[in-house]
């Protein structure tokens, strides 16, 4: 009898690509955007990366309550252990004092962010770039992330030009091999693997196969 236990991390095709995007941004600095349908392994990639590079990776998970520049900066300051001063300029300076060359900040659920948020965060990366240092900032969320940021608008062009990568993924890109990696216990059980692959390519994504 087969008994399934969830794997902590499987290097699936999409999750692996998102991991690589984070890595490139970490090494080169600047901004990167990776977004896609729910349940394709985005958060799994973030957790794996943060575990592998725990000393210089900061993860911030956004939500609808964290609206406005001050809320964003207060949240980031809290993650960095910086003083949450009352004014935005003081917050900015407090955050800079905690950031160091060679760090990467990953924003999960980035669809809750605005173009203004991105501009403020880019200023941190620019600050380090001007000193010949690197600070990578990665935005990860659903496809709305790109559209809400205004990727088709002229005012986004400057940010897009400064962005290392912008990638959008969908459940339709999930590979059969991904299911085999997630369910090694099903080796040789082609019918079951094909069924799970079919589920994974729906709106449920990979998450739908393990829940």
PLM ranges: what are they?
Residues 1-29:
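A short, basic N-terminal segment
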Residues 27-48, 64-65:
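Walker A/P-loop nucleotide-binding motif
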Residues 36-38, 113, 128-155:
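Sensor-1/coupling segment of RecA-like P-loop NTPase cores
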Residues 55-57, 152-172:
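A short helix-turn-beta junction within AAA+ P-loop NTPase domains corresponding to the substrate/partner-engaging
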Residues 68-86:
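Conserved NTP-binding/hydrolysis module of P-loop NTPases
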Residues 95-121, 125-128:
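Conserved P-loop NTPase "ATPase switch" module shared by AAA+ and STAND
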Residues 168-195:
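Conserved small helical "lid"/interfacial subdomain of P-loop NTPases
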Residues 200-211:
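The conserved phosphate-sensing helix
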